[in-house]
Amino acid sequence: MSNLKEIKRKIKSVHNTQKTTNAMKLVSTAKLKKAEEAAKRSKIYAQKIDEILSEISFQINKIVHNEDDVRLSLFHKKEQIKTVDLIFITADKGLCGGFNIKTLKTVSEMLKEYEAKNINIRLRAIGKTGIEYFNFQKIELLEKYFHLSSSPDYEKACEVIHAAVDDFLNGNTDEVILVHNGYKNMITQELKINHLIPVEPKSIEQTHNSLLELEPEGTELLEDLMKTYFEYNMYYALIDSLAAEHSARMQAMDNATNNAKARVKQLNLAYNKARQESITTELIEIISGVESMK
């Protein structure tokens, strides 16, 4: 009888877990739809800015005639890289499968790679998971940002990227790289590594088939465009990461719900078998008692 009570207790416990994971799956699905729409809208805008600034990087000398202009450094890779700033995004919350693992593994590998080349790498961490991971590894973080990956904010994104750009312009770092696990589709996330600064041309073909004409008076436009480019790339990465996080959590909770269903089914079979054995044992005892009284 005690065995039956224990199995029944387990069934109730797993069933409650199933309800919780299913509810979390539904919440993640609803949030994913909103995040997916926001990511798609932002991607179109970010890509267009990226295309324009990439084209400008081919024709930068037409705009900026002073070789000492600090803006030129944003378009030219330094011959010797001594310091690299790495901005990476992880989730603030758990229960999202292997979503954070890809990013943390990549950042760890990049750390080893740059250290092997005697290049100093400085980490700017966005998201509680990544911050706690590297704190546990006793690896110093230059900047820590909580609650930004779960609630993307444009002004906060600007604060993050402005600090990195200022460090680059002041000579404190030679390159800025942005790493995050992005949204590909409902069931797939895609690790993205964006070499943000210096700005590099994405396609040489653009120099041959350019429809963009630039004038010397375009220096003000260039400055505004660069500012928007850096800010929006940072903001888009946050939105893209959040959509991927909801996608990963939806999958993780769906798997957990299915596993709970399978476990309940197994426990029900075990309960019925144990109950049948208990009834059989009782019948045998009754029959034996009757026989002994004859």
UniProtKB/Swiss-Prot annotation:
Subcellular location as annotated: Cell inner membrane
Main subcellular localisation: membrane
Lineage top rank: taxon: Bacteria
Keyword hit for Ion transport: yes
InterPro entries: ATP_synth_F1_ATPase_gsu, ATP_synth_F1_gsu
Protein's job: Produces ATP from ADP in the presence of a proton gradient across the membrane. The gamma chain is believed to be important in regulating ATPase activity and the flow of protons through the CF(0) complex.
NCBIfam families noted in UniProt: ATPsyn_F1gamma
Subunit structure and binding partners: F-type ATPases have 2 components, CF(1) - the catalytic core - and CF(0) - the membrane proton channel. CF(1) has five subunits: alpha(3), beta(3), gamma(1), delta(1), epsilon(1). CF(0) has three main subunits: a, b and c.
Protein name in UniProt: ATP synthase gamma chain
Species this protein is from: Campylobacter jejuni (strain RM1221)
Gene responsible for this protein: atpG
